[in-house]
Every structure is written in structure tokens, then in C-alpha cells.
Amino acid sequence: MITLSNSIHLYARPDTKERLLEFFTSMLGLEAVASADAVGSPEPMYSFTFANGASLSVEFTQDALSSQQAQRGAWLELRSDDAVGLQQKVQAFGLKRVVHPYTPFFYVQAPGGQVFRIVASKEK
């Protein structure tokens, strides 16, 4: 049997660091934990643990994709008990809406370029 883990690692450019950390902490209510795994890295990696146990880490490097390039990377999904409220909150935060030409879903681009779909916890 093969399964997909619930651990994600992203790359983002250093100039997006403060705003991206603010997105995860202020907008999503997560704690940013500096990782001890980044031995020799000029920038610390940060990890975030979600309510369902999923984890996401971010590494800041100049080699990360641009925001435009990141739109062609993996798109992630955030599930919320108040999806509409979170959608409004991230738009007020200034995140860019991303429109997929073939789906009706709500997508935003986080600082750093990653695209997130925001859905209700009960959606499939």
C-alpha cells in the first residue's frame, strides 16, 4: 500500500518571509516554530502544525519560484469551519484571488506564491 503523507515542505523567497509568517500566524492562527533541522542554512526554516495534525514547513531561499511560477506548482487546500469568514479575512489581508478557468472554487495566493483553496470543513 502507498499513501500520501500529511507533511508539506514549501520554498519561498526571503523578501516574502514576514508577510508569509503573518499569513500563517495571524490569518490561520498557527504557531511558527523555527526548525532545528536547517543546519547551515542562512535562513531558519519554520514549521506549522494544523488542527488535524498535518504539518507544513517553509524554507526561505532566493532560489524559490517567483509568485507567477508558483501558480504552476502544487495547489494546497485549507479546510475551515468558517470558510466564508476565512475567505473574507484573507482578502482583507490583501491576498490575490486566483481564478482557475475550469473550476468554481475559491483560491488565493499566499505571500511567497503558494496557491490555497479554501473550503468548508464538511466539503469533499
Per-region residue spans from a language model:
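A generic fold-level signal
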Residues: T3, G40, A70-Q71, H100
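Conserved short beta-strand elements that form part of the metal-binding/catalytic scaffold
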Residues: E31-A70, V115-K122
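Conserved acetyl-CoA-binding loop of GNAT-fold acetyltransferases
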Residues: T25-V33, G94-K96
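Vicinal oxygen chelate
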Residues: A12-E18, Q71-V115
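Residues that flank catalytic or metal-binding motifs in active/ligand-binding sites
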Residues: L4, P44, A54, R72-A74, ...
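N-terminal beta-strand motif that seeds the catalytic metal site of vicinal oxygen chelate
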Residues: M1-L21, V33, G73-L76, K122-K124
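A short alpha-helix capping/helix-coil boundary motif
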Residues: M1, A64-S67, Q88
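Alpha-helical scaffold elements within enzyme catalytic domains, especially in hydrolases
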Residues: F23-S26, K89
